[in-house]
Amino acid sequence: MAEKKRIYKNDISSVLMLLALICLMAGGWYIARKKARLREASSLPFYKVELSQIADGEYEGQTMTSFLHLKLKVTVENHQLKDIEVLENDGIDGETAKPIIQKMIDENKVVVPAIKGAELGSLVYISCVSTAISL
């Protein structure tokens, strides 16, 4: 009977160690993905935009990353951001970061503070708008 208990305890220990190893590996993978996305977002093109130099019209911009594919139509009227329409939004943080559009329009600036909890998506939106009206 004592031998059965010992075998049972060894089985539980092995299972717990295996679960701990799986959790550590999953955590490492998650952290590595976050770092890769941060590196990718920080390498996006960001153009210094003077809205006073931008002619009235509609401009399309597209930014593709491994975590978010974004396509926007930016309307400039009287050197102000009049509207930013989302044409394509597919990926992580796309919907969560969408309120940054209203911030840009309200402040009439391309570079505005990121949406809390959707910082990487916010960077993609900023890059997409700056690319649209700069090129």
Predicted regions and their residues:
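Intrinsically disordered terminal and processing segments
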Residues: 1-71, 75-135
